[in-house]
């Protein structure tokens, strides 16, 4: 196999004393092998592959640009190495299978633009356009485990809204309006998932410990939570009351849009800071304050202080 990546990941930060600048003038493109360290990912390839198409890599390895090497002869490129193997395969073969997920296609597109691989840039852009054209439907995953939920949220480049509803968790009878309010929460979730399709990841959870609870996530962490249930007393008997805090749910959904990526560059930190968003404030905090911020979640429990006075609601 012409290109291979080392399994061990090394640091991309190399001391200045261990590096030197060299030029590849006068080399034989057909036979020379090159060792590349791309952001800590190690690759072997040939000069023929690197100079086959008119890209930035051809400029680097045909003598038009100087390259940086370490003491062991690895050529250092200060980029993420995740998709560099795909770049090499495209340079060698002129075609390559694209990733399935939109996020990975966008990542590959950014690398192709950096290395000036115009053909791959066009293929990535066409693939993204096709996804917009042929995948207009709304996908709402129903999680099967907490591990699956964590993976979904951690790997998504979108803010997320999760509705947990699980009637089987209730130990008591419901108040008279609870069934209607439970249905209203579910219907609102469906409406929001259609309204913000493509911008927000919506998740259903029917295995959790709560009866009805909304959770809102940004940049992979929980930002807010709205719990819609409480326990009330009616003639010395406990009952479960389900509320429908429509305005609060709309408010938290709009708040979570502040964490939406802008043109693939992440959320607008200036906007987050101006509106009090946590991510926008993070660069002003020391390590302890940052840890406290990450652990802090805005939790709203919908419960009226006069519940005992409304025994038969």
From Swiss-Prot:
Main location: nucleus
Keywords, in A-Z order: Acetylation, Nucleus, Phosphoprotein, Ubl conjugation pathway
Subunit composition and interactions: Homotetramer; forms a two-fold symmetric tetramer in solution. Interacts with CUL3; interaction is direct and forms a 5:5 heterodecamer. Component of the BCR(BACURD3) E3 ubiquitin ligase complex, at least composed of CUL3, KCTD10/BACURD3 and RBX1. Interacts with DNA polymerase delta subunit 2/POLD2. Interacts with PCNA.
GO MF term list: identical protein binding; Notch binding
GO cellular component: Cul3-RING ubiquitin ligase complex; cytosol; nucleoplasm; plasma membrane
Residues covered by the BTB domain: 32-100
Pathway the protein contributes to: Protein modification; protein ubiquitination
PROSITE patterns found in the cross-reference section: BTB (PS50097)
KW Nucleus (keyword) present: yes
Domain of life: Eukaryota
CDD domains, per the entry: BTB_POZ_KCTD10_BACURD3 (cd18399)
Renumbered ranges of motif PCNA-binding: 239-245
GO terms of biological process kind: negative regulation of Rho protein signal transduction; proteasome-mediated ubiquitin-dependent protein catabolic process; protein homooligomerization; protein ubiquitination; ubiquitin-dependent protein catabolic process
Family affiliation: Belongs to the BACURD family.
Modified residues annotated as N-acetylmethionine in this record: 1
Record's subcellular location: Nucleus
Protein name: BTB/POZ domain-containing adapter for CUL3-mediated RhoA degradation protein 3
SUPFAM superfamilies from the UniProt entry: POZ domain
A Pfam family that the UniProt record links to this protein: BTB_2
Claim: Acetylation is one of the keywords in the record: yes
Role noted for this protein: Substrate-specific adapter of a BCR (BTB-CUL3-RBX1) E3 ubiquitin-protein ligase complex. The BCR(BACURD3) E3 ubiquitin ligase complex mediates the ubiquitination of target proteins, leading to their degradation by the proteasome.
InterPro entries for this protein: BACURD1-3, BTB/POZ_dom, SKP1/BTB/POZ_sf, T1-type_BTB
Modified residues (Phosphoserine): 23
